[in-house]
């Protein structure tokens, strides 16, 4: 089923590995993470309002910074951000969901904000499997068995992976740009010239010049990505600066560069994730109820909805959000994204 929503007019908020745990995969300590004291910092939401207290918890390899808003006993939704963005993509989505009774958890991914590695010896790995393992470890640390997941960009890929490999942890899924699970083998195949052009930054990051350039010009680089990915989004300097603060994370550059080099097979992952990557390379179906979304002005590389629809074998709907909506759909069209979260369990 497909549905097209014009956010300029519609502003009403609507109401295998599947059986394996992290311990089974050799990540036994992840389920025994301990809470750390809450940080005093409070990320700022839209209009300067507080986006709830920023919390910290040890989970797996990380000490994760996250926002937790809404009733503590409400149904849980995890909202996962992409690159080069941060938790503030959901600054307007989270209050809408909290008002509807959801407990909303928005974590900084590894390499962003206040999320840090617990050991200096841990590889600053950005391969696709590791972010999914991070989030499952966070669920275990928070003692959350199941949740609704929403995401875009890296966050959508991470949510897709969890839904595909740990469906027992996922009630339902909202995924911007649909099915984003990939593999190194698939990424080695050349694309048509216009498609290759869209991935210019990936090829830049493959060089030492690119790594140095990103480190030296991180804010300017990421602001350019925002502009290219969402050409009709008139975000303010303050809006960008609010998210750019998360790029000060000491591991940000290393994680980002490794992510894009790993995709092309130019950097190795870690052996403990090989089995996960092997299963992901097979393109596993996603069986949980899913709404996929796309903005009509997404300037970033993304697949056409028809190309991935058959990957979702459970209850499924696609929504195209019109009105000049780009890549960062939750921040550009928060009501439409929240509406999808509220409806996905009732498909």
Locate the predicted segments by residue.
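C-terminal alpha-helix
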Residues: 340-347
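Conserved acidic functional residues
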Residues: 82, 153, 331-332
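Boundary at the C-terminal end of the N-terminal hydrophobic targeting segment
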Residues: 31-35
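Catalytic histidine-centered segment of alpha/beta-hydrolase-like enzymes
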Residues: 325-333
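Flexible "cap/lid" subdomain of the alpha/beta-hydrolase fold that forms the substrate-access gate
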Residues: 36-52, 61-64, 69, 76, ...
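N-terminal secretory signal peptides and thylakoid transit peptides that target proteins
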Residues: 2-20
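C-terminal segment of classical bacterial N-terminal signal peptides
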Residues: 22-30
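Conserved HGGG/HGGXW glycine-rich cap/lid loop of the alpha/beta-hydrolase fold
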Residues: 68-116
